[in-house]
Design a protein with these regions (language model features):
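C-terminal capping/lid region of NAD(P)-dependent oxidoreductase domains
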Residues: 3, 300-307, 315-334
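Short amphipathic alpha-helix with an adjacent loop that forms part of the alpha/beta core around
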Residues: 201-212
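N-terminal Rossmann-like NAD(P) cofactor-binding module of classical short-chain dehydrogenase/reductase
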Residues: 85, 150, 195, 215-218
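NAD(P)H dinucleotide-binding glycine-rich loop of Rossmann-like/cofactor-binding domains
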Residues: 65-69, 80-153
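Mid-domain Rossmann-like dinucleotide-binding core that forms the NAD(H)/NADP(H) cofactor-binding site
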Residues: 123-200
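Glycine-rich phosphate-binding loop and adjacent beta-alpha segment
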Residues: 224-300, 333-334
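A generic alpha-to-beta junction signature in SAM-dependent methyltransferases
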Residues: 143, 210, 233-234
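Glycine-rich beta-strand-centered segment in the early N-terminal region that forms part
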Residues: 27-45, 49-93
Length: 334
């Protein structure tokens, strides 16, 4: 069995380039006891990969999750014909032993056979992004009916999901995104207010949208935008820090700066917690998938994907999400 995979050719400097990744082909060995062979059906590109890549060695397979079909198996827990979601990397075929394979510490799990939902959802609203939205918002922010929730990166795979859960919980939702087109889409999803950070003054826009302050903040970007939000939070507000995409491509010359937030954390007794969903919530993984599935089937949770056809286009799709080109979840169909 031949496998194609993208390996790290050069460490990223600033915005990733297609030449930083190299497409190689190799012959896979026969599987041994305890192993199973999968073929990718859908692959994912996500912003966290930009931050994690520094932990790879040159020549290693680029990290990433995929939904794959089991073609061969000598592991009774992973039978032939079943579909699995796993952190197998940017590769068309992979041999797994059922354990966590890379620095994300995310083991493969079998996709339920009776879910009757599109397989690609297990990379989005029923996968790592969906679980990040679920646990980050509900466990850390704990929004209550009538409260105000602000989410940055609102047009991305995690952000648009956070906003929808907040609406399910009876909250007023403000999404911050980078285009008027995405803003209009978010309004159609039910967001109460949308701010275009590229064209609007964030401080003025927040004061207008939420004059009574902010109770919960789901932070996907960091930087000065987060400072603006945190300065407007109410007493005992809660902050879930999921990502910091504003600095992922930064270099020493253009590292983002932001106003101090410590006085506001102290004065308003704010609760702020960063989290890595695959580490903190692995023992509750299916809880989020089950609930998100229920909301999806009830029509309360909408799915949005930007699909790229062709395995060879993975680097281009990855660069696209770092530029905010995607709406919702970015998916590659090989």
């Amino acid at each position: 069995m031949k496998a194609k995979r993208f390996v790290l050719e050069k460490y990223f400097e600033g915005m990733p380039k297609e030449s930083d990744l190299k497409l190689v082909e190799e012959e896979l060995p026969e599987i041994t006891d305890g192993e199973f062979l999968v073929e990718a059906v859908y692959l994912s590109v996500d912003p966290y990969m930009r931050a994690y890549v520094s932990g790879l060695k040159l020549g290693q397979t680029m990290i990433g999750c995929q939904v794959a079909k089991i073609l061969q198996s000598k592991n009774s827990s992973y039978p032939v014909g079943r579909y699995v979601s796993g952190q197998f990397g940017w590769t068309t075929h992979f041999i797994s032993n059922g354990k966590a394979q890379d620095i994300t510490n995310y083991p493969p799990f079998l996709i339920p056979e009776d879910n009757n939902v599109p397989l690609s959802l297990f990379l989005g609203i029923l996968g790592r992004p969906g679980n990040s939205a679920y646990f980050g918002l509900l466990d850390i922010c704990n929004p209550q009916p009538g409260e105000t929730v602000v989410v940055t990166g609102a047009g991305g795979a995690v952000g648009y999901h956070v906003g929808q859960i907040a609406k399910i919980k009876g909250c007023t939702v403000v999404g911050i995104t980078g285009s008027d087109e995405k803003g209009a889409w978010l309004k159609r999803l039910g967001f109460d207010h949308v701010i275009n950070y590229k064209t609007e003054d964030i401080s003025l826009a927040l004061d207008k949208a939420v004059p009574e302050g902010i109770d919960c903040y789901f932070d996907n970007v960091g930087g000065e935008i987060s400072s603006c939000v945190i300065q407007r939070m109410n007493k005992y507000g809660r902050i879930a820090v999921c990502g910091s995409i504003s600095m992922y491509n930064a270099t020493a010359e253009n590292y983002p700066t932001a106003r101090m937030i410590q006085p506001f954390l102290v004065t308003n007794e704010l609760y702020m917690k960063g989290f890595i969903v695959g580490r903190t919530y692995l023992n509750r993984w299916m809880e989020a998938i089950d609930q998100n599935t229920k909301w999806y089937k009830e029509g309360k949770l909408q799915n949005q994907e930007t699909v790229t056809e062709g395995f060879e286009h993975m680097p281009k799709a990855f660069i696209g999400i770092m530029s905010g080109d995607n709406w919702g979840k970015a998916i590659i169909k090989p």
